[in-house]
């Protein structure tokens, strides 16, 4: 497996693959890989001739008081895991390579980015869409792979791809979970054993909300209150949001119908975790 650290090196690598008529799949990550990332890589491996994974902790998607400095990094470990999942090349640039001095251009999707995670993390999605559009320009893949756990992010990127005419297919892969239901996240490593138990509140709340809807409850406020009650029953939890939204527009629902997104963000101690589930509600 190749390690590429400059944009020029990636362009050369991609040009050689294209000369041979090979298709390219891109798996964008911030590293500290877990089984969720590896499931993206394996899907890319099945569907493309060449798989490139980017590993870049992107400073522009972190707010001033967020965890950019302490976000876990371990490139050697990541390279081994990526190789094991069938990745052909890892692109791991320095910050200066992606954002040289005087960098001043940003990509912003409006509307979809102003709710849910966008409401509590202003500027976050601007950073995501900027770095992803840069990666798309550098790698020019046929397909790019994102996880369902970051549902809003995937939706925003699909909108960006449509609006800016990127000739790239966006593929979302189901959330990978621990045996007890906790969604895999690089940030789970911040949790103490007690907090790890409290982190189960996210999955439990989604389960509860889904069960209420399947049993016929159609008032979003009733379902949301039940989910909030489940979360706050656990120690060290603090709700950022619990939302019941249209899965395509992210607009909040009062009456539950159609493709419905149950999404939540919860602080467990000093760690912010997210999770979601999508339901088809056709009465």
From Swiss-Prot:
Q: A GO BP term, please?
A: pantothenate biosynthetic process
The record lists the catalysed reaction(s) as: (R)-pantoate + beta-alanine + ATP = (R)-pantothenate + AMP + diphosphate + H(+)
Residues the entry annotates as binding ATP: 30-37, 147-150, 176, 184-187
**Lineage: superkingdom:** Bacteria
* Any one GO molecular-function label of the UniProt entry: pantoate-beta-alanine ligase activity
Primary localisation category = cytoplasm
Binding residue positions for (R)-pantoate: 61, 153
Query: Which EC numbers characterise this protein's activity in its record?
Result: 6.3.2.1
Keyword line: ATP-binding, Cytoplasm, Ligase, Nucleotide-binding, Pantothenate biosynthesis
- The active site of this protein is located at 37
Note the InterPro entries from the entry.
Cyt_trans-like, Pantoate_ligase, Pantoate_ligase_C, Rossmann-like_a/b/a_fold
Supply the enzyme class, top level.
Answer: ligase
Q: Where does beta-alanine bind?
A: 61
* Family to which the UniProt record says this protein belongs: Belongs to the pantothenate synthetase family.
The free-text function statement in the UniProt record for this protein reads: Catalyzes the condensation of pantoate with beta-alanine in an ATP-dependent reaction via a pantoyl-adenylate intermediate.
Task: State how it assembles.
Answer: Homodimer.
What is the official name of this protein in its record? Pantothenate synthetase
Gene (UniProt): panC
